[in-house]
């Protein structure tokens, strides 16, 4: 399918290295970004990292606001503060929730956004999309893509291993997401970008290679993962949608998040969904599952405390989460019996 217009939204600069948060002011000013600046962060992150960043901005006008979750209430709070202080640039310092709030507010008020992630837990650190609770759906919405990403590997490598593994899980999901995209292009005439899809798959390949590296050198492994997450976000920016990074595995994850909220990390659910959807696609799901085990990702629902019936129910409703997004689940989805069989044969449930 040919598109009349295709807009590619990419970062202007990506800074990646060790102890580079000390250079943040230099980076910001080199991009000709002006104050007042608003730093969106979290309570824990502020104590460890954000206060250090604020010291670097002592000659600039800087405001700080703390958020806990990516909800529309938090978005409204941050937006009100940004407008009241006539903010020109928003800097997100934290994990996925904080980054999502920061870039969604930047999108709503038309200001530049800088991403400074503190955990490599998902590819939202780069993408022009955000997941915000309270908008009536658990899927991603358009947001402001970062003009710059500042990825300090020492900061990212200090994140809990579970968050690092979740980032691997989220990135592995590109394997089935791209296959779903190809299916939608073939059966529904959707736009499909071969180069963009290849970039997403390369991200998944590098994420899978992290297991061996992380065990030997955490910082080296986290650098590979961070670059994979950035590449995945870039793929979404090039595609103009989340298609190369989000397919049936994400629909399953979103279904779990609705049925059994706040019990698992997003990347952990995507990882489970990837095993299940790989099975349906006829992809070598056993190889994917084996790689996940090596990383330390959960491969069974009970490892996350999720009841079997929730897994089955999620499989039966996943196709309804985003009806306009065609995937291997089709328009009708799975019956309870089919869902139970798939979940058992893949070992997700006993």
Curated annotation (Swiss-Prot):
Zn(2+) binds at residues 170, 250, 266. GO terms for biological process: glycerophospholipid metabolic process; phospholipid biosynthetic process. SUPFAM superfamilies: Dehydroquinate synthase-like. Belongs to the glycerol-1-phosphate dehydrogenase family. This is Glycerol-1-phosphate dehydrogenase [NAD(P)+]. Binds 1 zinc ion per subunit. Homodimer. Substrate binds at residues 123, 170, 254. It is found in: Cytoplasm. The gene is egsA. Its EC number is 1.1.1.261. The keyword Cell membrane does not apply. Its main location: cytoplasm. It catalyses: sn-glycerol 1-phosphate + NAD(+) = dihydroxyacetone phosphate + NADH + H(+); sn-glycerol 1-phosphate + NADP(+) = dihydroxyacetone phosphate + NADPH + H(+). One of its GO terms (cellular component) is cytoplasm. HAMAP family: G1P_dehydrogenase_A. Its cofactor is Zn(2+). PANTHER family: GLYCEROL DEHYDROGENASE (PTHR43616), GLYCEROL DEHYDROGENASE 1 (PTHR43616:SF5). Coiled coil: none annotated. GO terms for molecular function: glycerol-1-phosphate dehydrogenase (NAD+) activity; glycerol-1-phosphate dehydrogenase (NADP+) activity; metal ion binding. It is an enzyme of class 1 (oxidoreductase).
């Amino acid at each position: 399918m040919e598109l009349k217009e295709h807009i590619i939204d990419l970062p202007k600069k990506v800074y990646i290295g060790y102890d580079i948060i000390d250079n943040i002011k230099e980076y910001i000013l080199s991009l000709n970004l002006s104050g007042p600046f608003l730093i969106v962060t979290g309570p824990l992150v502020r104590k460890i990292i954000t206060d250090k960043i604020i010291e670097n901005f002592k000659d600039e006008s800087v405001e700080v606001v703390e958020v806990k979750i990516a909800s529309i209430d938090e978005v409204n709070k941050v937006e009100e503060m940004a407008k009241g202080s006539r903010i020109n640039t928003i800097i997100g310092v934290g994990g996925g929730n904080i980054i999502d709030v920061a870039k969604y507010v930047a999108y709503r008020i038309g200001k530049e956004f800088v991403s400074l992630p503190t955990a490599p837990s998902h590819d939202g650190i780069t993408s022009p999309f955000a997941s915000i609770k309270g908008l009536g759906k658990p899927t991603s919405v358009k947001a402001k893509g970062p003009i710059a990403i500042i990825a300090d590997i020492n900061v990212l490598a200090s994140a809990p291993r579970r968050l690092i593994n979740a980032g691997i899980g989220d990135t592995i999901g590109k394997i089935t997401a791209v296959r779903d995209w190809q299916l939608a292009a073939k059966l529904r005439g959707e736009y499909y970008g071969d180069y963009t899809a290849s970039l997403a798959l390369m991200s998944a390949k590098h994420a899978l290679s992290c297991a061996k590296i992380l065990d030997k050198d955490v910082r080296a492994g986290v650098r590979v993962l961070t670059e994979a997450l950035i590449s995945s976000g870039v793929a979404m920016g090039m595609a103009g949608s989340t298609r190369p990074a989000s397919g049936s595995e994400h629909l399953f994850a979103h279904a779990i998040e609705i049925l059994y909220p706040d019990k698992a990390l997003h990347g952990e659910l995507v990882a489970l969904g990837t095993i299940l959807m790989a099975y349906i696609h006829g992809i070598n799901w056993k190889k994917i599952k084996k790689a996940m085990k090596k990383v330390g990702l959960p491969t069974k629902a009970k490892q996350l405390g999720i009841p079997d019936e929730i897994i089955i129910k999620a499989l039966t409703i996943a196709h309804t989460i985003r009806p306009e997004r065609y995937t291997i689940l089709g328009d009708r989805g799975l019956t309870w019996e089919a869902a139970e069989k798939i979940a058992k044969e893949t070992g997700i449930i006993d």
